[in-house]
C-alpha cells in the first residue's frame, strides 16, 4: 500500500476487501458514500439487477463510478475472435454508447461526467484476438503486456503520455460518474 498513503497504517481511513455475488450484495441499504463497479457488468447476464444492487447500497447523495468496455474497441475484439467472447466468465455483452448512462439516469441518478480510459489496451487485445486469446506467451503479446503493467504501476513518462492521448480516440473502457 506504499503507493496509497491514505491506506497506510497511520491513516484514519478504513477499508475492507471481500468477495460477493453482485446480485445479492451483503450490505444494508444505503451503506456507502462511494461505490465503484469497474469492468464487471459486461460479465453478468442480469446486469440490470446488479445496477439495482449498486443503487440499493449507495447512500442518498452518494457517488457511483462505473466502467465497461467501450463499444467499438470491444466489437473489434468480438469480430477478430470467437474465443474472446465465448470464454467462460468472459464478456457476454457489448454496451452501446449511452446505454449504461440511460440505465442509471432512468433510475434517478444524474450523470456527472464520463471519459475513456486504457487507450493502450485496445491494440493489446486486438493483438491477442488476432494471435489467439489464450496465446499470452507469444513474444509480442508478452512484451506488450509487460509494457501495460509497467505503465499502470508507474503511470508517468512517454508511455503514459501516449496512453492518455489515445484514451479519447480508442480507450478500451468508458467510465461514468453518477450522483
Labelled PLM ranges:
Residues 11-13, 88, 110:
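Residue-level signal for beta-strand positions within conserved beta-sheet cores that form or flank
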Residues 103-109:
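A structural motif corresponding to the C-terminal end of an alpha-helix
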Residues 79, 118-179:
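A C-terminal cap/extension of S-adenosyl-L-methionine-dependent methyltransferases
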Amino acid at each position: 500500500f506504499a503507493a496509497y498513503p491514505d491506506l497506510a497504517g497511520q491513516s484514519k481511513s478504513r477499508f475492507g476487501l471481500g468477495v460477493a455475488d453482485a446480485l445479492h450484495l451483503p450490505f444494508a441499504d444505503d451503506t456507502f458514500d462511494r461505490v465503484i463497479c469497474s469492468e464487471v457488468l459486461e460479465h453478468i447476464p442480469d446486469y440490470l439487477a446488479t445496477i439495482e444492487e449498486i443503487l440499493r447500497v449507495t447512500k442518498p447523495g452518494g457517488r457511483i463510478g462505473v466502467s465497461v468496455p467501450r463499444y467499438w474497441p470491444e466489437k473489434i475484439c468480438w469480430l477478430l475472435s470467437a474465443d474472446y467472447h465465448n470464454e467462460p466468465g468472459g464478456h457476454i455483452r457489448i454496451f452501446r454508447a449511452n446505454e449504461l448512462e440511460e440505465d442509471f439516469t432512468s433510475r434517478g441518478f444524474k450523470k456527472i461526467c464520463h471519459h475513456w480510459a486504457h487507450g493502450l489496451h485496445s491494440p493489446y487485445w486486438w493483438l491477442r484476438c488476432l494471435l489467439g486469446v489464450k496465446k499470452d506467451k507469444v513474444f509480442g503479446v508478452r512484451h506488450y503486456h509487460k509494457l501495460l503493467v509497467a505503465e499502470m504501476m508507474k503511470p508517468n513518462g512517454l508511455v503514459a503520455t501516449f496512453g492518455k492521448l489515445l484514451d479519447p480516440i480508442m480507450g478500451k473502457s468508458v467510465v461514468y460518474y453518477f450522483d
